[in-house]
A protein has these predicted regions:
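Helix-termination/interfacial motifs at the ends of transmembrane alpha-helices
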Residues: 7-10, 14-26, 128-207
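Large intracellular
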Residues: 4, 8, 15-139, 211-253
Length: 253
């Protein structure tokens, strides 16, 4: 469970809700037609940009923003070096049955044990990386689309409200309440875009970048293990994937 995402998302929404409660009547900020225009319109516009299957599949990708727990790259390096040491001393078949934490690394080692060539293994793993990134990018695209559509639908709802207000100006006392209702759609659109969609899109993008880096690290690890590379030489290559502050510490192990 990613506490930072939950805290940021619900904390941001909580601040908005708290300000509404402290500022006056809650009912003033609730208007069903405005909600229908913004929420319904936003999702319909988003559906125009991606397929229904991608739209539904994106919600599974969204869970990664809250449930994602990746393996630190330094741990991947440590595991890869251990496997490389065994493979160099006892042969690649000695890795069969090893308990490997990272599934992608485990898949790569199994391909090596099955006797596939280095080129074939690299091609299959690279394809897996690209397809996974495509799936993640669909989720990111959906939330970016929501972030773009929500304010626009909010503005459309506000314009609808203004037209209705201007068409019924016989009673001056009704102008203020009608204007408030018209502006609610803009508020809803801004909240959906800036407090929900944009933060989730940014989080998914950060997770995708981190996973891509980890998988490229594994890709190079598998190639080194399969080629019988010296574990120390492999370690020197892999520490390049770490932040500068962690490279010297990891290289000294």
């Amino acid at each position: 469970m990613d506490i930072a995402t939950l805290l940021g998302l619900f904390g941001g929404l909580g601040v908005i809700v708290a300000s509404i409660f402290l500022g006056g009547s809650v009912n003033t900020f609730v208007n069903i037609p405005s909600i229908v225009v913004v929420v319904g319109g936003t999702f319909m516009v988003t559906l125009c940009q991606i397929s229904l299957a991608q739209f539904l599949g994106s919600f599974k990708v969204t869970l990664r923003a809250f449930m994602h727990k990746s393996i630190p790259p330094e741990k991947l390096i440590e595991e890869a070096i251990g496997l490389a040491d065994v493979a160099r001393k006892e042969g690649i078949l000695a890795l069969e049955g090893n308990d490997i934490d990272d599934k992608f690394l485990d898949d790569g080692i199994k391909l090596c044990i099955d006797g596939h060539s280095t080129e074939t293994v690299q091609k299959m793993l690279s394809k897996d990386i690209n397809l996974e990134l495509d799936r993640q990018n669909t989720g990111i695209l959906m939330f970016k689309s929501i972030a773009e559509a929500a304010p626009a639908m909010g503005m459309i709802g506000t314009l609808i409200g203004l037209v209705q207000m201007l068409a019924n100006m016989d009673d001056p006392k009704s102008i203020g309440p009608a204007m408030a209702v018209a502006l609610l759609t803009t508020l809803y659109g801004a909240i959906i875009a800036n407090a929900i969609a944009l933060p989730i899109a940014a989080k998914l993008k950060a997770i995708s970048a981190h996973e891509r880096l980890n998988k490229l690290l594994v890709l190079e690890s598998v190639a080194g293990i399969q080629d019988g590379m010296n574990p120390r030489v492999l370690q020197q290559q892999l520490v390049a994937y770490l932040p500068e502050s962690k490279r010297e510490l990891n290289a000294g192990k």
